[in-house]
């Protein structure tokens, strides 16, 4: 079956449908990861977006329940060059085609993803319509233009937990996956923290528990007073989807916690912290999405290759003098990390937990533990 990808600027790509049929509209973006497509599909940060993978062959190892970063996929559509129709992995439970069909997510293969990526890199991320139903390219372009983008959108309310809960109280979900037999012993809980769920990935929760954190997950709309009533040792701000400017309730809450608890934010949490500091964000031309983004630590001069997924960045000129930019992206010079010079608060724009991606930045979880220990 024919699949049509129409961009709001009139560019048309034709391919073959896989997964579900139907019509979906959202911002189209590209991810440069070679593997980890299931983690990409189930990352809540992709809520409202159509994702194109730049690696040419996708679906090689199928899908399984263990590697999901949330309970369900969040992308609106999935664009690839070639689908591997016969997955080959002993852990595979379902093909990518069947998985997307079960979750009613349309996909398109046979798309020239290199040409699509070059177009988005030149023109910028934009709204798109992915359809197996609309036969007229002009109509599909009109649907794309009339659809919602990401700017001004609060998708966090769609993906946050509705209730407060304790992550993995029985220590059954946080052990590292390994081929080796025998149980892996998790460290004792040294610090109890509250984690704001703006769209949090499971591997963040696993990474925190593996470093000795006991984690209470709270909805994104939880107030500062409600958090303080839990009396945590620290506060974690998670990743998530949408426009950080559209979350005034989160800005207010974090502002109310500053100076009262140590705070560590990543991705959207980093951007929310930027607003809480009194700063602002701006939309990147095409975002940073993939596992090969070079980031420089301005204090040590060291460079790490990082996993990233964001379309906005903190404006360094908007930050007050009490806030120091600590990390920058070597590709475009944008802010990748910051800290408060006087308060126990720091954040990074990227994903130290990876999943998928390199583990160069996993040490930030240990730094958070040290920050809490030194602040108590």
Role assignments for model-derived ranges:
Residues 1-225, 229-230, 244, 355-357, ...:
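RNA-binding accessory domains that recognize and position tRNA/RNA substrates
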Residues 4-5, 43, 294-296, 327, ...:
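Residue-level detector of beta-strand face positions
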Residues 17-18, 56, 309, 340, ...:
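Residue-level structural signal for beta-strand termini and adjacent loop
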Residues 106, 192, 262-264, 280, ...:
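Proline-centered loop/turn at the N-terminus of a beta-strand
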Residues 192-197, 306-307, 346-350:
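Active-site-proximal beta-strand elements of phosphoester/diester hydrolases
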Residues 234, 239-308, 313, 357-367, ...:
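Cysteine-nucleophile active-site neighborhood
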Residues 301-343, 376:
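Catalytic beta-strand/loop cores that center a nucleophilic Ser/Cys/Thr
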Residues 337-375:
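A glycine-centered loop/beta-turn motif at secondary-structure junctions
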């Amino acid at each position: 079956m024919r699949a049509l990808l129409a961009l709001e600027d009139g560019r048309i790509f034709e391919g073959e449908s896989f997964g579900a049929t139907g019509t979906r509209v959202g911002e189209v973006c590209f991810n440069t990861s070679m593997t980890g497509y299931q983690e990409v599909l189930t990352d809540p940060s992709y809520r409202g977006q159509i994702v194109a993978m730049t690696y040419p062959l996708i679906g090689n190892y199928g899908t399984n329940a263990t590697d999901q970063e949330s309970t369900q996929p969040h992308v609106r559509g999935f664009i690839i060059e070639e689908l591997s129709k016969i997955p080959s992995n002993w852990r595979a439970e379902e093909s990518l085609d069947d998985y997307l069909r079960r979750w009613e997510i349309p996909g398109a293969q046979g798309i020239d993803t290199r040409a699509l990526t070059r177009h988005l890199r030149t023109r910028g991320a934009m709204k798109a319509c992915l359809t197996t139903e609309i036969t007229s390219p002009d109509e599909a372009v009109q649907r794309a233009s009339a659809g919602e983008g990401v700017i001004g959108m609060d998708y966090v309310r769609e993906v946050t937990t509705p209730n407060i809960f304790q992550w993995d109280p029985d220590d059954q979900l946080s052990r590292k996956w390994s081929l080796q037999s025998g149980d892996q012993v998790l460290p004792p809980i040294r610090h109890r923290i509250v984690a704001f769920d703006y769209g949090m990935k499971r591997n963040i929760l696993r990474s925190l528990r593996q470093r000795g954190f006991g984690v209470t997950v709270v909805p994104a709309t939880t107030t500062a007073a409600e958090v303080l009533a839990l009396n945590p040792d620290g506060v974690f701000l998670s990743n998530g989807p949408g426009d950080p400017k559209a979350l005034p309730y989160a800005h207010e809450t974090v502002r109310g916690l500053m100076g009262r608890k140590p705070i560590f934010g990543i991705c959207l949490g980093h951007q929310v912290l930027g607003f809480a500091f009194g700063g602002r964000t701006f939309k990147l031309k095409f975002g940073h999405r993939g596992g090969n983004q070079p980031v420089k630590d301005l204090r040590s001069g060291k460079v790490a290759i990082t996993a990233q997924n964001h379309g906005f960045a903190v404006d360094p000129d908007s930050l007050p003098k009490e806030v120091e930019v600590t990390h920058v992206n070597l590709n475009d010079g944008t802010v990748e990390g910051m800290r408060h010079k006087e308060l126990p608060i720091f954040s990074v724009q990227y994903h130290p937990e990876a999943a998928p991606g390199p583990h160069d930045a996993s040490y930030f979880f240990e730094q958070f533990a040290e920050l809490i220990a030194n602040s108590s």
